[in-house]
Amino acid sequence: FPANRLITQFNITNDSLEFWINDRKRMPDTLHVFVDYMKTDTLGKLTPFTEHIRMTMENSGGKSKSSKRNIKHEDTTCVMTVKAEPERVEQYGFEMEFNFPLIYEHFDSVKLTSINPRQQEAKMKFSVTRDSLNLRKYVLMPEGKLMSGYEYKLKVPHRMFRDINGFYNDSSEVKVSLPKDDKLSSLTLNLTGVNHKYIVDLLNEQRDKVLRSYIIEKDSELLFPYLKEGKYSV
């Protein structure tokens, strides 16, 4: 297949590769993949090596009528998830992730609305950025400061996105507000003597989730709001 028909993505450690074939033609029974890389030989030296991988398509000819009737709605839909966490929406916005890469996108039709305490609605502008590590994920970041007591609603109309399988999305709507719990606290870090670029992460006690992250290159005051009682790591 030509390069323009392939969608590829390496994982964060650059040792695994995902690829999708963007071609509506009938696929052959066996896909031959040739991978060129440097391999250690018997003398411990790195030498060029080509590995031939045969990927055989699953046999679908014997499917019964009953199995076809068991096809779920998500099997014929561009499946996506849209989420926004109250504690993180100021920095991370609304996150949209699709099960498969997109071949058609229409973010201009997505609507972001703010609703004030008087239930008055106003349209908001937002920017769209594709995640640098996951090409199936997009971040929709509201422009302007988010206000406590307001509700923010993101509405995605149907048939605005089409994935590599040719399926369109269903409509979706997500609402979020900034936390208002009086028991929440905030942490402020004053960093001095900074003369290089640093990434400062606040993690939970298990250190398996980044709650908020900053990239700094000079002395900075970093705010970590909406913290529940507990232990954290920086």
Residue ranges of each PLM-predicted region?
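N-terminal targeting or signal-anchor segments and their processing/structural boundaries
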Residues: F1-V234
